[in-house]
From Swiss-Prot:
Region annotation G4: where it falls in the sequence: 136-139
Entry-linked InterPro entries: EF-Tu_GTP-bd, EF-Tu_GTPase, EFTu-like_2, EFTU_2, G_TR_CS, P-loop_NTPase, Small_GTP-bd, T_Tr_GTP-bd_dom
Name under which the protein is recorded: Elongation factor Tu
Domain of life, per lineage: Bacteria
Length: 394
């Protein structure tokens, strides 16, 4: 059979499983691919195909992640599942697999456990917008009242981290029974798929967002002016558009007088394109790598922010010793390093390699910044951590 063409007809949504170890995240992932494949087509994946997750690198950090896909009536889903707790932490902080929504798997037999709580907190910090709950192993609990108690406990936990606990869909089922072909439990997998379709809104495509291009290089072309190059992160730039140059210095306004790609002139460049943008009346020395071109008023420069960070362990090539308050590494945003001073949370004396922690950072130069922006923490070019901006302070 010929290879199927990737159908772009259905909207594409990124999801992932989160939750405590051994509550059934990988079994549920297998059940979703297997049971939805029967009805909507696609490849079924067995537990052991998902469990031996390959290594991948994101922002200098090695993460084990499994990627599977499945279809529903109306959508195509890309789903990530991680083998270990540390992989989840790294995945969510680096944004290696940006999630439009998460499926929180919680065993009905155990109820919420420490990692259940930690994953919900992480989802909140890194900006996962929606959580849907799958209460797993319900076949092991024969008391309906107990199921109700666990459900209430999960809703309270979600609400305590500012998710709408009362409105989150909660599906009670058993991933293992569904995989074994129990019709009633298979139905619960379809119920979960329907909840994904209806509760997670279709994400806005990158090309529909306001224009942003991180500047990688700057050239001056005699008789034409200054050209900056980079990959358009989102939106579209048209010839004649007003744009702002944001970060590192005072924000400057300019106009795009030309877009070129592969030495050809275009009318526009869009998300994903590597382009050169010609700027009217801008001097070569006014622009540098690390700034961004953006649609006016859509992004502002900041120096102080709160972040959720993962610090590499010694085995991962990170630091061998803890760091303390006033630690001053470089923060690598998009295309450049900026030095910053770290303040720790109240009651935190030090941060050990291998930990994830909330910090406040004050940079020595402003960077175009918004919540959800990812960065690497580096010491002399060596990556020692990764982080995500959870809130902008100043």
């Amino acid at each position: 059979m010929a290879k199927e063409k990737f159908e772009r007809s259905k909207p594409h949504v990124n999801v992932g499983t989160i939750g405590h170890v051994d509550h059934g995240k990988t079994t549920l992932t297998a059940a979703l691919t297997t049971i939805l494949a029967k009805k909507f087509g696609g490849a079924a994946k067995a537990y052991d195909q998902i469990d031996n997750a390959p290594e991948e690198k994101a922002r200098g950090i090695t993460i084990n992640t499994s990627h599977v896909e499945y279809e529903t009536e109306t959508r195509h889903y890309a789903h990530v599942d991680c083998p270990g707790h540390a992989d989840y932490v790294k995945n969510m902080i680096t944004g290696a697999a940006q999630m439009d929504g998460a499926i929180l798997v919680c065993s009905a037999a155990d109820g919420p456990m420490p990692q259940t709580r930690e994953h919900i907190l992480l989802a909140r910090q890194v900006g996962v917008p929606y959580i849907i709950v799958f209460m797993n192993k319900c076949d092991m609990v024969d008391d309906a009242e107990l199921l109700e108690l666990v459900e209430m406990e999960i809703r309270d936990l979600l609400s305590s981290y500012d998710f709408p606990g009362d409105d989150c869909p909660i599906v009670q089922g058993s991933a293992l029974k569904a995989l074994e072909g129990d019709a009633a439990y298979e139905e619960k997998i379809f119920e979960l798929a329907t909840a994904l379709d209806s509760y997670i809104p279709t994400p806005e495509r990158a090309v529909d967002k306001p224009f942003l291009l991180p500047i990688e290089d700057v050239f001056s072309i005699s008789g034409r002016g200054t050209v900056v190059t980079g990959r358009v992160e989102r939106g579209i730039i048209h010839v004649g558009d007003e744009i702002e140059i944001v970060g590192l210095k005072e924000t400057q306004k300019t106009t795009c007088t030309g877009v070129e790609m592969f030495r050809k002139l275009l009318d526009e460049g869009q998300a994903g394109d590597n382009v050169g943008v010609l700027l009217r009346g801008t001097k070569r020395e006014d622009v540098e790598r690390g700034q961004v071109l953006a649609k006016p008023g859509t992004i502002t420069p900041h120096t102080k922010f709160k972040a959720e960070v993962y610090v590499l362990s010694k085995e991962e090539g990170g630091r061998h010793t803890p760091f303390f308050a006033n630690y001053r590494p470089q923060f690598y945003f998009r295309t450049t390093d900026v030095t910053g001073a770290v303040t720790l949370e109240k009651g935190v004396e030090m941060v050990m390699p291998g930990e994830n922690v909330t910090i406040t950072v004050e940079l020595i130069a402003p960077i175009a910044m918004e919540e959800g922006l990812r960065f690497a923490i580096r010491e002399g070019g060596r990556t020692v951590g990764a982080g995500v901006v959870s809130s902008v302070i100043a």
